[in-house]
Amino acid sequence: VSAYFHSGEKDTPKQEAKMAHLPRIGTRMAELIAEEAAGGISSLVCGDFNVVRSEADIKNWKPNHNKRAGVLDEEIAFLNQWVVEGWRDAVRDLAGDVQGPYSWWSWRGQAFVNNAGWRIDYQYATPALGERARSFAIGRADEYAERFSDHAPVSVTYEI
């Protein structure tokens, strides 16, 4: 499943729409987990979620936490609840308890040069598939001028 959650803007109708959409996504994700548990197919939900899961997922936590969309506790709670319900955050599982790895950097300032990024692009795997994740790569450009997007591709290799 390819997913895009718009970024929202704190205290605006856009953010209200985002917050109304997250429970609907959670309902579908619960259906996919149940399907795998019943012997059905495994699933992968991946894409730009526009939300960090924790302090490890953003270089500048303190100035952003609960001040900007994507770093609000109520958004973070949804992503973490999906993990509690059984989804595997493949990159975090493979990377371990480290800062980053980031997949998005603002075009403004020196964010890319200073690696002041956010980890907001995910691969959430159902449990059986998540156990088969073997490696990951973030396709970060070597130089600012080589960037084709403010995001870098996130790849995970699964042994199937």
Model-derived segments and their meaning:
Residues 1-160:
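Active-site regions of metal-assisted phosphoester/phosphodiester hydrolases
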